[in-house]
Amino acid sequence: MNKNNVLRGLLVLAGLSLSSLALAHGDVTPQAVDTKGLEPLGKEWRDTNPYRKPYAKHDLAVEIGASAYNQNCARCHGLEAKSGGIAPDLRLLETGAEGDEWFKERVINGAVRDGAVYMPKMADFISQEGLWAIRSYLESVHVDE
């Protein structure tokens, strides 16, 4: 009987540990993005990613974008942009202007279906600079299907 109680206790502990890992991807509340060092873009949205190569500070944009992605996007879209099936795998997003168009539309308008919010309007919380830095990061981890 004592062994059964110990086993049950270990199973509960293991379950709690695993559930905390599931929540460790990111915070639900959007986090500020420090874009120091990137060209300020102003209020009007660009149609294409201004931080794409040959932008001189492209590598800095990718670094900022990786951090911002992990803080704001990974909870739903997965660590390193590898989706676990909850939300689209952003590594598969088209590169270049076509992918920029979809990205811009989604971060500005979010995703709502039948009144349920599947993705918040991230542009309400994160600057254009921060979001284009995230886009730069996503292009750096792009994979073909």
From Swiss-Prot:
Q: Which UniProt keywords apply?
A: Electron transport, Heme, Iron, Metal-binding, Periplasm, Signal, Transport
Q: Give the Gene Ontology MF terms in alphabetical order.
A: electron transfer activity; heme binding; metal ion binding
Q: Which residues bind heme c?
A: C73, C76, H77, M119
Tell whether NAD is among the UniProt keywords. Answer: no
Q: Where is the Cytochrome c domain?
A: 60-142
Q: How does it assemble?
A: Monomer. Interacts with the quinoprotein ethanol dehydrogenase (QEDH) ExaA.
Question: To which pathway does this protein belong?
Answer: Alcohol metabolism; ethanol degradation; acetate from ethanol
Q: Which PANTHER family match?
A: CYTOCHROME C-553-LIKE, MENAQUINOL-CYTOCHROME C REDUCTASE CYTOCHROME B_C SUBUNIT
Q: Phenotype upon knockout?
A: Cells lacking this gene are completely unable to grow on ethanol as the sole carbon source.
GO annotations of cellular component type: periplasmic space
Upregulation details from the record are: Induced by growth on ethanol.
Keyword Iron present in the record's keywords: the answer is yes
Q: Which NCBIfam families match?
A: c550_PedF
Entry protein name: Cytochrome c550
Name the species this protein comes from.
Pseudomonas aeruginosa (strain ATCC 15692 / DSM 22644 / CIP 104116 / JCM 14847 / LMG 12228 / 1C / PRS 101 / PAO1)
**What is the annotated localization of this protein?**
Periplasm
Q: Which domain of life is it from?
A: Bacteria
The entry's function note states: Is an essential component of the ethanol oxidation system that allows P.aeruginosa to grow on ethanol as the sole carbon and energy source. Is the direct electron acceptor of the quinoprotein ethanol dehydrogenase (QEDH).
- Known post-translational modifications? Binds 1 heme group per subunit.
Which region is the signal sequence?
Answer: 1-24
